[in-house]
Design a protein with these regions (language model features):
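Loop-rich non-cytosolic ectodomains and luminal regions
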Residues: 1-179
């Protein structure tokens, strides 16, 4: 599959299909908006062998943006879109109809990598923010669950503090694997 993209801004301005460029980042501007979009096409990504389209928006106009995906060949469309991880965009950037069951990305989505899910050990509940499988290729992931909510660990100056998230879960997983 080879895909290309276009956009519709909250104000209704449309950027038609942006042709695939193998060598350079494409800078897209709007007539009526201050938003600038950068599009990078990577036809064969080195880690997956699949196409990657990286989209970066500067000063996006608030509202609903539409991403239009075009395919080059007449076959069923099979693509996935992910938002940046927490902290790389504002919390009000969301998909209107997200799929919560294909959230893992590289490297956790690759077969030889062990991918833990994060859970709260005190009540055995999974973290809603934890990545979930299947992968985009249908592999079953995560491989197991590891504590990652309110995990006590070393802090500054010999103190201890609680941490939560995938990093805490990964630290416990790494320690267990080292044993």
């Amino acid at each position: 599959q080879l895909f290309s993209v276009g956009f519709r801004s909250p104000g209704g301005e449309t950027i038609p299909r942006i042709p695939v460029s193998l060598t350079q980042e494409q800078r897209i501007t709007f007539v009526l908006e201050r938003t600038v979009i950068y599009v990078n096409y990577e036809v064969v990504q080195t880690t997956t062998g699949s196409q990657l389209i990286l989209i970066r928006m500067l000063d996006p106009t608030p509202g609903i943006w539409t991403l239009q995906v075009y395919r080059a060949f007449p076959s069923p469309p099979d693509f996935h879109v992910w938002l940046p991880i927490t902290g790389f965009s504002t919390s009000d950037v969301i998909f209107l109809e997200p799929d919560p069951y294909t959230t893992l990305t590289t490297p956790s989505a690759t077969v030889p990598v062990l991918s833990p899910s994060t859970y709260q050990a005190s009540n055995n509940s999974f973290s809603p923010e934890s990545g979930r499988g299947f992968t985009r290729l249908g592999e079953i992931k995560p491989d197991f669950a590891s504590p990652g909510i309110s995990v006590t660990g070393p802090g500054p100056a010999g103190s201890y503090e609680n941490r939560s998230g995938a990093s805490a879960s990964a630290a416990i997983t790494s320690g267990a694997a080292a044993l």
